[in-house]
Protein backbone atom coordinates (compact mmCIF):
# COMPACT_ATOMS: atom_id res chain seq x y z
CA UNK A 1 0.00 0.00 0.00
CA UNK A 2 1.31 3.45 -0.93
CA UNK A 3 1.28 5.93 1.94
CA UNK A 4 0.81 9.56 0.92
CA UNK A 5 3.09 12.35 2.19
CA UNK A 6 0.09 13.87 3.95
CA UNK A 7 -0.51 10.66 5.88
CA UNK A 8 3.10 10.66 7.02
CA UNK A 9 3.02 14.34 7.94
CA UNK A 10 0.12 14.27 10.34
CA UNK A 11 -2.66 12.22 11.80
CA UNK A 12 -6.17 13.64 11.66
CA UNK A 13 -8.08 13.35 14.91
CA UNK A 14 -11.77 13.99 15.47
CA UNK A 15 -12.43 16.55 18.17
CA UNK A 16 -15.73 17.28 19.93
CA UNK A 17 -17.70 20.19 18.52
CA UNK A 18 -18.18 23.24 20.70
CA UNK A 19 -21.83 23.35 19.65
CA UNK A 20 -22.55 19.89 18.24
CA UNK A 21 -22.56 16.40 19.63
CA UNK A 22 -19.60 14.12 18.98
CA UNK A 23 -20.96 10.96 17.39
CA UNK A 24 -19.43 7.60 18.18
CA UNK A 25 -19.71 5.04 15.43
CA UNK A 26 -21.63 2.68 17.72
CA UNK A 27 -24.19 5.41 18.52
CA UNK A 28 -24.77 6.09 14.84
CA UNK A 29 -25.16 2.36 14.21
CA UNK A 30 -27.77 2.30 16.99
CA UNK A 31 -29.76 4.92 15.07
CA UNK A 32 -29.64 2.72 11.97
CA UNK A 33 -31.09 -0.08 14.11
CA UNK A 34 -34.21 1.82 15.19
CA UNK A 35 -37.56 0.55 13.88
CA UNK A 36 -37.92 2.00 10.39
CA UNK A 37 -40.98 4.18 11.01
CA UNK A 38 -39.64 5.41 14.35
CA UNK A 39 -36.40 6.46 12.66
CA UNK A 40 -38.23 8.30 9.88
CA UNK A 41 -40.49 10.04 12.40
CA UNK A 42 -37.54 11.21 14.50
CA UNK A 43 -35.67 12.47 11.43
CA UNK A 44 -38.75 14.28 10.11
CA UNK A 45 -39.23 16.05 13.43
CA UNK A 46 -35.62 17.25 13.47
CA UNK A 47 -35.91 18.32 9.84
CA UNK A 48 -38.97 20.47 10.58
CA UNK A 49 -37.21 22.10 13.51
CA UNK A 50 -34.46 23.36 11.21
CA UNK A 51 -35.95 23.72 7.72
CA UNK A 52 -39.14 24.38 5.83
CA UNK A 53 -39.94 20.76 4.86
CA UNK A 54 -41.49 21.85 1.55
CA UNK A 55 -38.41 23.67 0.26
CA UNK A 56 -35.94 21.75 -1.91
CA UNK A 57 -32.59 23.22 -2.92
CA UNK A 58 -31.89 22.51 -6.60
CA UNK A 59 -28.32 22.14 -7.87
CA UNK A 60 -27.13 21.37 -11.38
CA UNK A 61 -23.87 19.46 -11.84
CA UNK A 62 -21.65 19.72 -14.92
CA UNK A 63 -18.43 17.91 -15.75
CA UNK A 64 -16.21 20.64 -17.17
CA UNK A 65 -13.27 18.28 -17.72
CA UNK A 66 -14.17 14.60 -18.22
CA UNK A 67 -12.24 11.33 -18.09
CA UNK A 68 -8.61 10.30 -17.76
CA UNK A 69 -8.42 10.76 -13.99
CA UNK A 70 -5.26 9.20 -12.45
CA UNK A 71 -7.12 8.16 -9.28
CA UNK A 72 -8.36 4.55 -9.07
CA UNK A 73 -11.67 5.02 -7.21
CA UNK A 74 -13.49 1.70 -7.57
CA UNK A 75 -16.84 3.38 -8.19
CA UNK A 76 -15.79 5.93 -10.81
CA UNK A 77 -16.10 5.52 -14.61
CA UNK A 78 -13.76 8.50 -15.13
CA UNK A 79 -10.73 6.68 -13.74
CA UNK A 80 -7.97 5.96 -16.25
CA UNK A 81 -7.45 2.67 -14.39
CA UNK A 82 -10.81 1.27 -15.53
CA UNK A 83 -11.99 0.22 -18.98
CA UNK A 84 -15.36 1.97 -19.14
CA UNK A 85 -15.20 3.25 -22.72
CA UNK A 86 -15.35 6.81 -21.43
CA UNK A 87 -13.07 9.00 -23.49
CA UNK A 88 -10.84 11.71 -22.10
CA UNK A 89 -12.06 15.21 -22.90
CA UNK A 90 -10.38 18.58 -22.59
CA UNK A 91 -11.67 21.42 -20.43
CA UNK A 92 -14.86 22.95 -21.78
CA UNK A 93 -14.79 26.52 -23.05
CA UNK A 94 -15.91 29.23 -20.64
CA UNK A 95 -18.72 30.37 -22.96
CA UNK A 96 -20.08 26.84 -23.23
CA UNK A 97 -20.07 26.41 -19.45
CA UNK A 98 -21.80 29.75 -18.91
CA UNK A 99 -24.48 28.81 -21.43
CA UNK A 100 -25.09 25.56 -19.52
CA UNK A 101 -25.36 27.57 -16.30
CA UNK A 102 -27.89 29.95 -17.87
CA UNK A 103 -30.03 27.00 -18.92
CA UNK A 104 -29.80 25.49 -15.43
CA UNK A 105 -30.86 28.79 -13.84
CA UNK A 106 -33.78 29.20 -16.25
CA UNK A 107 -35.01 25.75 -15.18
CA UNK A 108 -34.94 26.56 -11.47
CA UNK A 109 -31.47 25.60 -10.25
CA UNK A 110 -30.04 27.99 -7.65
CA UNK A 111 -26.56 26.43 -7.51
CA UNK A 112 -24.24 25.45 -10.34
CA UNK A 113 -21.72 22.74 -9.47
CA UNK A 114 -18.69 22.06 -11.64
CA UNK A 115 -16.45 19.00 -11.54
CA UNK A 116 -13.09 18.22 -13.13
CA UNK A 117 -11.57 14.74 -13.47
CA UNK A 118 -8.05 15.12 -12.15
CA UNK A 119 -6.23 14.33 -8.90
CA UNK A 120 -5.90 18.01 -8.18
CA UNK A 121 -5.58 21.24 -10.16
CA UNK A 122 -2.34 22.80 -11.30
CA UNK A 123 -1.88 26.56 -10.77
CA UNK A 124 -2.88 27.24 -14.40
CA UNK A 125 -6.04 25.16 -13.87
CA UNK A 126 -6.97 27.31 -10.87
CA UNK A 127 -6.66 30.39 -13.08
CA UNK A 128 -8.96 28.81 -15.65
CA UNK A 129 -11.64 27.68 -13.21
CA UNK A 130 -11.46 31.03 -11.40
CA UNK A 131 -12.48 32.75 -14.63
CA UNK A 132 -15.32 30.26 -15.02
CA UNK A 133 -16.47 30.80 -11.43
CA UNK A 134 -16.56 34.58 -11.91
CA UNK A 135 -18.64 34.21 -15.06
CA UNK A 136 -21.17 31.85 -13.46
CA UNK A 137 -21.34 33.93 -10.30
CA UNK A 138 -22.21 36.90 -12.50
CA UNK A 139 -25.44 35.13 -13.44
CA UNK A 140 -26.64 35.39 -9.84
CA UNK A 141 -26.14 31.72 -8.99
CA UNK A 142 -24.35 30.01 -6.14
CA UNK A 143 -21.22 28.20 -7.29
CA UNK A 144 -19.72 24.91 -6.19
CA UNK A 145 -16.55 23.23 -7.39
CA UNK A 146 -15.23 19.70 -7.07
CA UNK A 147 -11.65 19.95 -8.25
CA UNK A 148 -9.82 17.36 -6.16
CA UNK A 149 -6.98 17.87 -3.70
CA UNK A 150 -5.79 21.45 -3.26
CA UNK A 151 -2.34 22.85 -2.64
CA UNK A 152 -1.64 25.78 -0.32
CA UNK A 153 -3.26 29.01 -1.47
CA UNK A 154 -5.57 27.44 -4.04
CA UNK A 155 -8.67 27.52 -1.84
CA UNK A 156 -8.08 31.22 -1.18
CA UNK A 157 -7.82 31.86 -4.94
CA UNK A 158 -11.11 30.05 -5.54
CA UNK A 159 -12.76 31.97 -2.73
CA UNK A 160 -11.56 35.26 -4.21
CA UNK A 161 -13.01 34.25 -7.59
CA UNK A 162 -16.43 33.91 -5.97
CA UNK A 163 -16.70 30.19 -5.23
CA UNK A 164 -19.31 29.51 -2.54
CA UNK A 165 -18.98 25.76 -1.90
CA UNK A 166 -16.19 23.24 -2.35
CA UNK A 167 -17.20 19.61 -2.73
CA UNK A 168 -14.78 17.03 -1.37
CA UNK A 169 -16.44 13.78 -0.33
CA UNK A 170 -15.15 11.39 2.33
CA UNK A 171 -16.47 8.57 0.10
CA UNK A 172 -16.82 5.78 2.67
CA UNK A 173 -16.01 4.65 6.22
CA UNK A 174 -12.40 5.66 7.01
CA UNK A 175 -11.73 2.09 8.17
CA UNK A 176 -12.36 0.70 4.67
CA UNK A 177 -11.11 3.62 2.63
CA UNK A 178 -8.29 1.66 1.02
CA UNK A 179 -10.69 -1.09 -0.02
CA UNK A 180 -12.20 1.45 -2.40
CA UNK A 181 -9.30 3.77 -3.28
CA UNK A 182 -5.57 3.05 -3.34
CA UNK A 183 -4.13 6.20 -4.90
CA UNK A 184 -4.93 8.44 -1.93
CA UNK A 185 -5.66 8.21 1.79
CA UNK A 186 -8.52 9.37 3.97
CA UNK A 187 -6.10 11.87 5.53
CA UNK A 188 -5.59 13.47 2.12
CA UNK A 189 -9.29 14.29 2.02
CA UNK A 190 -9.17 15.74 5.51
CA UNK A 191 -6.18 17.88 4.57
CA UNK A 192 -8.00 19.51 1.65
CA UNK A 193 -11.14 20.00 3.73
CA UNK A 194 -9.01 21.86 6.25
CA UNK A 195 -7.65 24.14 3.52
CA UNK A 196 -11.18 24.80 2.28
CA UNK A 197 -12.45 25.73 5.74
CA UNK A 198 -9.46 27.93 6.47
CA UNK A 199 -10.16 29.86 3.26
CA UNK A 200 -13.71 30.59 4.40
CA UNK A 201 -15.46 28.42 1.82
CA UNK A 202 -18.58 26.44 2.61
CA UNK A 203 -18.14 22.68 2.58
CA UNK A 204 -20.09 20.15 0.54
CA UNK A 205 -19.03 16.72 1.81
CA UNK A 206 -20.77 13.37 1.69
CA UNK A 207 -20.21 9.84 0.47
CA UNK A 208 -21.47 6.82 -1.43
CA UNK A 209 -23.46 3.89 -0.11
CA UNK A 210 -24.14 0.58 -1.82
CA UNK A 211 -20.45 -0.33 -2.30
CA UNK A 212 -20.80 -3.71 -0.52
CA UNK A 213 -20.27 -2.02 2.84
CA UNK A 214 -21.88 -3.25 6.06
CA UNK A 215 -24.36 -1.24 8.06
CA UNK A 216 -21.62 -0.57 10.61
CA UNK A 217 -19.47 0.87 7.82
CA UNK A 218 -22.34 3.08 6.67
CA UNK A 219 -22.54 4.28 10.26
CA UNK A 220 -18.80 4.97 10.15
CA UNK A 221 -19.22 7.17 7.08
CA UNK A 222 -22.03 9.19 8.67
CA UNK A 223 -20.09 9.53 11.93
CA UNK A 224 -17.02 10.82 10.08
CA UNK A 225 -19.18 13.44 8.34
CA UNK A 226 -21.08 14.46 11.47
CA UNK A 227 -17.83 14.88 13.41
CA UNK A 228 -16.34 17.37 10.98
CA UNK A 229 -15.96 20.68 12.78
CA UNK A 230 -17.98 22.55 11.76
CA UNK A 231 -20.38 20.17 10.09
CA UNK A 232 -20.71 20.43 6.28
CA UNK A 233 -23.27 22.92 5.01
CA UNK A 234 -24.20 20.39 2.33
CA UNK A 235 -24.11 16.58 2.59
CA UNK A 236 -24.62 14.65 -0.67
CA UNK A 237 -25.65 11.03 -0.11
CA UNK A 238 -25.00 9.01 -3.26
CA UNK A 239 -26.40 5.59 -4.09
CA UNK A 240 -23.83 3.70 -6.13
CA UNK A 241 -24.44 3.83 -9.87
CA UNK A 242 -22.91 0.61 -11.15
CA UNK A 243 -20.91 1.15 -14.34
CA UNK A 244 -19.56 -1.70 -16.46
CA UNK A 245 -15.78 -1.80 -16.33
CA UNK A 246 -15.43 -0.50 -12.78
CA UNK A 247 -14.49 -2.85 -9.92
CA UNK A 248 -17.92 -2.27 -8.33
CA UNK A 249 -19.94 -3.04 -11.44
CA UNK A 250 -21.26 -6.23 -9.80
CA UNK A 251 -21.84 -4.81 -6.33
CA UNK A 252 -24.85 -6.14 -4.47
CA UNK A 253 -27.88 -3.86 -4.65
CA UNK A 254 -28.53 -1.88 -1.49
CA UNK A 255 -32.05 -2.40 -0.17
CA UNK A 256 -34.12 0.76 -0.61
CA UNK A 257 -35.06 0.92 3.07
CA UNK A 258 -31.38 0.95 4.01
CA UNK A 259 -30.80 3.94 1.76
CA UNK A 260 -33.73 5.80 3.32
CA UNK A 261 -32.32 4.93 6.74
CA UNK A 262 -29.02 6.51 5.68
CA UNK A 263 -30.80 9.74 4.73
CA UNK A 264 -32.65 9.76 8.06
CA UNK A 265 -29.50 9.14 10.11
CA UNK A 266 -27.69 11.89 8.20
CA UNK A 267 -30.51 14.28 9.05
CA UNK A 268 -30.51 13.36 12.75
CA UNK A 269 -26.74 13.65 13.13
CA UNK A 270 -26.40 16.79 10.97
CA UNK A 271 -29.61 18.70 11.72
CA UNK A 272 -28.62 22.00 10.09
CA UNK A 273 -26.98 20.62 6.95
CA UNK A 274 -28.65 20.36 3.57
CA UNK A 275 -28.88 16.63 2.89
CA UNK A 276 -28.75 16.05 -0.85
CA UNK A 277 -30.35 13.12 -2.61
CA UNK A 278 -27.56 12.69 -5.15
CA UNK A 279 -26.37 10.01 -7.60
CA UNK A 280 -28.53 6.97 -8.17
CA UNK A 281 -31.84 8.82 -8.16
CA UNK A 282 -32.70 7.76 -11.72
CA UNK A 283 -33.22 4.21 -10.39
CA UNK A 284 -35.34 5.29 -7.42
CA UNK A 285 -39.14 4.97 -7.66
CA UNK A 286 -41.09 8.12 -6.83
CA UNK A 287 -42.34 6.61 -3.57
CA UNK A 288 -38.77 5.95 -2.44
CA UNK A 289 -37.77 9.52 -3.21
CA UNK A 290 -40.81 10.76 -1.30
CA UNK A 291 -39.69 8.73 1.72
CA UNK A 292 -36.24 10.31 1.44
CA UNK A 293 -37.76 13.79 1.50
CA UNK A 294 -39.84 12.81 4.50
CA UNK A 295 -36.67 11.49 6.19
CA UNK A 296 -34.90 14.82 5.79
CA UNK A 297 -33.46 15.11 2.28
CA UNK A 298 -33.92 18.70 1.12
CA UNK A 299 -31.66 19.04 -1.90
CA UNK A 300 -31.34 17.27 -5.26
CA UNK A 301 -29.23 17.43 -8.37
CA UNK A 302 -31.52 18.83 -11.05
CA UNK A 303 -30.89 17.97 -14.70
CA UNK A 304 -30.80 14.84 -16.84
CA UNK A 305 -27.10 14.13 -16.28
CA UNK A 306 -24.64 14.26 -13.40
CA UNK A 307 -20.92 14.06 -14.18
CA UNK A 308 -21.18 11.08 -16.52
CA UNK A 309 -24.23 9.13 -15.30
CA UNK A 310 -27.95 9.62 -15.83
CA UNK A 311 -30.36 11.57 -13.64
CA UNK A 312 -34.13 12.13 -13.81
CA UNK A 313 -35.03 14.83 -16.33
CA UNK A 314 -36.29 18.22 -15.20
CA UNK A 315 -39.87 17.56 -16.30
CA UNK A 316 -40.02 14.38 -14.22
CA UNK A 317 -38.63 16.17 -11.18
CA UNK A 318 -41.04 19.08 -11.64
CA UNK A 319 -43.99 16.70 -11.77
CA UNK A 320 -42.79 14.80 -8.70
CA UNK A 321 -42.33 18.01 -6.73
CA UNK A 322 -45.83 19.12 -7.69
CA UNK A 323 -47.25 15.78 -6.55
CA UNK A 324 -45.49 16.16 -3.20
CA UNK A 325 -46.31 19.90 -2.86
CA UNK A 326 -42.61 20.76 -2.79
CA UNK A 327 -41.05 23.86 -4.31
CA UNK A 328 -37.52 25.11 -5.11
CA UNK A 329 -35.53 27.05 -2.56
CA UNK A 330 -34.65 30.45 -3.97
CA UNK A 331 -31.06 31.61 -3.75
CA UNK A 332 -30.66 34.98 -2.03
CA UNK A 333 -28.06 37.02 -3.94
CA UNK A 334 -25.17 38.75 -2.21
CA UNK A 335 -22.85 41.62 -3.07
CA UNK A 336 -23.69 44.20 -5.71
CA UNK A 337 -26.87 42.48 -6.90
CA UNK A 338 -28.23 42.28 -3.36
CA UNK A 339 -27.43 45.96 -2.75
CA UNK A 340 -29.28 46.99 -5.92
CA UNK A 341 -32.34 44.98 -4.92
CA UNK A 342 -32.30 46.35 -1.37
CA UNK A 343 -31.94 49.97 -2.48
CA UNK A 344 -34.53 49.85 -5.24
CA UNK A 345 -37.01 47.37 -3.86
CA UNK A 346 -36.98 45.76 -7.29
CA UNK A 347 -36.03 42.13 -7.87
CA UNK A 348 -33.24 41.99 -10.43
CA UNK A 349 -34.01 39.77 -13.43
CA UNK A 350 -30.84 37.85 -14.22
From Swiss-Prot:
Name of the protein in its database record: Biotin synthase
Catalytic reactions of this protein: (4R,5S)-dethiobiotin + (sulfur carrier)-SH + 2 reduced [2Fe-2S]-[ferredoxin] + 2 S-adenosyl-L-methionine = (sulfur carrier)-H + biotin + 2 5'-deoxyadenosine + 2 L-methionine + 2 oxidized [2Fe-2S]-[ferredoxin]
GO molecular function: 2 iron, 2 sulfur cluster binding; 4 iron, 4 sulfur cluster binding; biotin synthase activity; iron ion binding
Domain called Radical SAM core: residue spans: 54-278
List of residues binding [2Fe-2S] cluster: 113, 144, 204, 276
Cofactor notes: Binds 1 [4Fe-4S] cluster. The cluster is coordinated with 3 cysteines and an exchangeable S-adenosyl-L-methionine.
SMART domains membership: BATS (SM00876), Elp3 (SM00729)
Source organism superkingdom: Bacteria
EC top class named in words: transferase
GO biological process, one term: biotin biosynthetic process
